[in-house]
Every structure is written in C-alpha cells, then in structure tokens.
Amino acid sequence: MEHVKYILKQSWSRHSSSKWTEECPSCGQCGVTALVIQDHFGGTIFKTRVDESWHFYNSINGVVYDFTSEQFQAPIEYQHIPSSREEAFLDTNEEQYQHLREAFSRHMNSISEET
C-alpha cells in the first residue's frame, strides 16, 4: 500500500481540502481520503479523537491504514472507533470528495499503465 501514499500525495490539493499546503499536503484531508480509499479498496472507516476533532482513517482486511497521520505533530493514540461514510462526509463536501476521487483514480490508472 506504499504506492497508495505516493498517489495520494500526488492527488491532494487545495481542491480536496482548504487546509492543504505544500509543507503539509495531508492537512485536512482525513475524511475525504478515508472515503476515497474505501471507494477503491473497501474496508471500514474508523475515527479517533485528536485534540477537539475527529480524525478518520481506514481498516482494510483487518489492517489499519492512516494515510494522513503526518499532519499531526504528536503521535496519535488510536481508539479505532467504527465510523461511517456519513460521518466522514461531515469533514468534507461533495466538491472536495469528487475532486480527490477523480484525481486519485487518474493517478492510479497512470501508474497501472506504466507497469
């Protein structure tokens, strides 16, 4: 799944999160990323409280993947609370979701064509 992290970094932008910066591309991307990853790989969306907000991430075939953890300075104390697409959508909007979904698919397809 290391290639997925690379593809996400290529796909994240201001269009997928208003908090995006070049210095911290994963900032504000957790909900939208969890949704797009679930679209492509299935699995479950989990949440954990970080400071005053919910942080969303995925579990696929029993393995936890948090592709946006680097946005936080301190290590995350994961609670692995089952969440839902509806909850993750509260962290984003349809426009950001569609943008990341399309960008991620485009980058996935270009890598597939190269191999």
Curated annotation (Swiss-Prot):
- Domain of life assignment: Bacteria
- Offer one Pfam family short name for this entry: YunG
Report the protein name in the record.
Answer: Uncharacterized protein YunG
* Phylogenetic lineage: Bacteria, Bacillati, Bacillota, Bacilli, Bacillales
